[in-house]
Amino acid sequence: MRALAEKGFNLDEALVHHSAMTDEHGYRSMQRFLKRPNPPTAVLCSSTVTALGAVRAINQAGLVIGTDISLIAHDDVLPMLKPENFSVPLTTTRSSLRAAGARIAKRLIGGILDQGDYPEQELWRAELIVRASTGPAPDRQRNSGKTV
């Protein structure tokens, strides 16, 4: 959110939803977003599983992914749900789950053994894999402001 503010954007808190990363939660959240007077033109899901539900809601609303609304998800590396196999191949971010797991284990063990001073949170780089689910924002007169 700080990065958005630094670029002059305001974040509409009603467009942020935290939930379990399931397809049902993705579906319900997307339904709620799409019912807003000014629905979003792009959505970022925390996982491809959540995006699966978001896709269902978008399709039921009669919108075209990548044209009417862009969709991005995290977790490019889930073997059981490949983003390129979605009806519209899904743009994703990718970061190493193995490296993250190793880092978490190191921090937990270090904390238990009182070895090392670890920050409460860390930022990791993620690779953006662009596919067909993203495109230019639709030309909507109502979305001419800088609120995201």
Model regions and ranges:
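Bacterial carbohydrate/catabolite-sensing allosteric modules
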Residues: 1-148
